[in-house]
From Swiss-Prot:
The keyword Ribosomal protein applies. GO terms for cellular component: cytosolic large ribosomal subunit. This is Large ribosomal subunit protein uL13. Belongs to the universal ribosomal protein uL13 family. It comes from Rubrobacter xylanophilus (strain DSM 9941 / JCM 11954 / NBRC 16129 / PRD-1).
Amino acid sequence: MKSYMARPGEVERKWYVIDAEGKTLGRLAAEISRLLRGKNKPQYTPHVDVGDFVVVVNADKVEVTGRKAEQKVYRWHTGYPGGLRERSYRQMLRKRPEEILRQAVRGMMPKTRLARRQLKKLRIYAGPEHPHAGQTPEPYEVR
């Protein structure tokens, strides 16, 4: 008996909507990365994109444990000399709450071309509304 290998044309994708309100950042990001990669499906194949689309709402209400709210710092470099920038978790939550969750999910994905393509199937919104009602996303409960 041969092993099953999924082909890109025969993959059936679903849309899931996840409410991030009151969820822990890391646990939520781990579950989202599993869905994006397709590891929840029996036809998972490492070199084929078999993952689903994920819509996250209420990203501004995600929680962190311990003292991360005061101590966590996001750093990046602009590419110019002296261009190291940093923002605290609280500043990021105020200015760009979607980016907190996007960076957490990105850190849990492999650093490959396939993972970058899979990350494009992630849609994050700060509030409770999203424009993807036409795709009829199923609610997905994160444990």
